[in-house]
Amino acid sequence: MARKEKNDYFQMIEEQVAHARDAAWLLNEILTDFRPNELPANRARMHEIEHGADIKKHDMMEKLIREFITPIEREDLRDMSEEIDTVTDLIEDVLNKIYIYNVAKMRPEALEFAALILRSCDDLVAIAQRLGDFRKNREEIGHGTVSYTHLRAHETGAYL
């Protein structure tokens, strides 16, 4: 009898977070060295990252549907995956809005905001890397979550 392949959901989460971080890095790079004439090519690069993230999310959802037992609640895994995908989608949306509104010059506040997004995604990467052994890494995950939440609050303040 063929042995059933084990699904590593925490690895899948980590891969999704890597896509969000790649998108944040690309956004930061584009805004730091802003060249409006390169926006179409940069949007295509960003869309490749976002599409890769969508594929990872869909793969995980397919596996969750078929899996009988998961390491944590199925709904929690689904919610994490959806939220991470939303982060990646929203990062892509920033670049799309810059293109749609024909932005010609980047304001310093936008650069600060892009750097905050990148730092937030770095925190998500650190958290995701520890999820595989969440019982052992409970404290580090907690600290990472607090740091991420603090950055999110700062982002909200910077945006308003």
Positions of predicted regions on the chain:
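Hydrophobic/aromatic-rich structural module bridging two neighboring secondary-structure elements via a short loop
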Residues: P40, H47, D59-L90
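Intrinsic-disorder/low-complexity, polar/charged segments
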Residues: K6, R35, D79-E82, T156
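Leu/Val/Ala/Ile-rich N-terminal alpha-helices, chiefly Sec-type signal peptides and the beginnings
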Residues: M1-G52, K56-M60, L64
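Short, charged, low-complexity loops and linkers
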Residues: M1-Q11, T32-A44, F68-E75, I98-L111, ...
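A structural signal for well-ordered alpha-helices, especially hydrophobic packing surfaces
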Residues: V17, R21-L31, E50, K57, ...
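Conserved small/polar residues in nucleotide/adenosyl-binding loops
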Residues: T149-T156
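Secondary-structure edge/capping motif, primarily at the C-terminal ends of alpha-helices
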Residues: A24-E38, M60, L64-F68, V94-K105, ...
